[in-house]
Amino acid sequence: MIARSEQAAMRGRTVLITGGTGGIGYQTARVLARQGARVLITGLETGPGEDAAAAIRRESGQELVRFLQADHATVAGNQQLADQVRAAVPGLDVLVNNVGGLYQTRRETADGYEATLAMNFVGPVALTGELLPLLQASAPARCVNVVSAGFKLWKPDPFQDLQSTQRYVSGDVYAHTKLLNVLVSLALARRLPAEQVTVNLVHPGMSWTPMTQSMTSQTMPSLRLVWPLVRLVQRRRSPEKAGQRVAFLASSPRVSGYTGQYFEGKPTPKRLSARELDPEYQERAWQLGAELVAGAGTRHRSG
């Protein structure tokens, strides 16, 4: 996937990977550190985060690997992370929005938002907005948003029941919020010249991570009939391969001209549906993201 000639492609470049202390994010960080990148990884817990950074330093020989503590569930937490990044590095070449959430029971964050919506949509919008000037100053730069092909399973209007108060099924809410992430990412890509900052989406594939281990047949009722097969595929696929796919989007010269694209598989660009490609839907997601970031913590929202 990453050619031998690309092994040193990231020397002198700085990458931030959210949720980089475990699972796919950790594996992505390992690959990019081996390619010579200065790597910043984030997580909620300091102990495991520092341990993860130390392990990557030992394995890669890259001393410029650092952990930053962050609460991605709140807008303020993402803003504080951006402050840490600005203080830690002079520029940012790649932002990998990898962290996400899937919760078996409904809960709300300190901002008053349903937690899946906060982690998978509001948080990435807030962080990307804060760090965009740093990316632009480092042009050509990249924003890689990790999503799930599960977004295709969400068929209702994506702008209804945002707080999931009418119905809460964890896998469905996850698909809903990932669809919103796809839409807002495409809206951002249209706003930025490709030679300045590219914005792409990647589905790294199913793999055996802490998130997938927490899933049950009740998580995604639409997959209940094939759940044993889904479980088998998850168990047989390691997060290492998924991390390589994300790292490919973050580093490979072979995708330097792409923006506003969704990647799957090897990974290769895949055509999205008319719904995802609809500029009106993308703009509605953009406005929604701006409203939720601005309104964080001011009141509880519904609908």
Please give the residue ranges for each predicted region.
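C-terminal helical subdomain
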Residues: 177, 227-270, 279-287
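Short acidic, glycine/proline-rich loop/turn micro-motifs
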Residues: 108-109, 272-276
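A glycine/serine/threonine-rich, flexible loop-to-helix segment
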Residues: 208-230
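C-terminal amphipathic/interface module of NAD(P)-dependent oxidoreductases
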Residues: 275-303
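Rossmann-fold NAD(P)H-dependent dehydrogenase/reductase core
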Residues: 1-215, 293-303
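Short glycine/proline- and charge-enriched loop/turn segments
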Residues: 159-168, 220-228, 266-270
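A recurrent short beta-strand within the Rossmann-like NAD(P)-dependent oxidoreductase core
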Residues: 143, 199-201, 246, 260-263, ...
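Short active-site-adjacent structural elements
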Residues: 150, 270-272
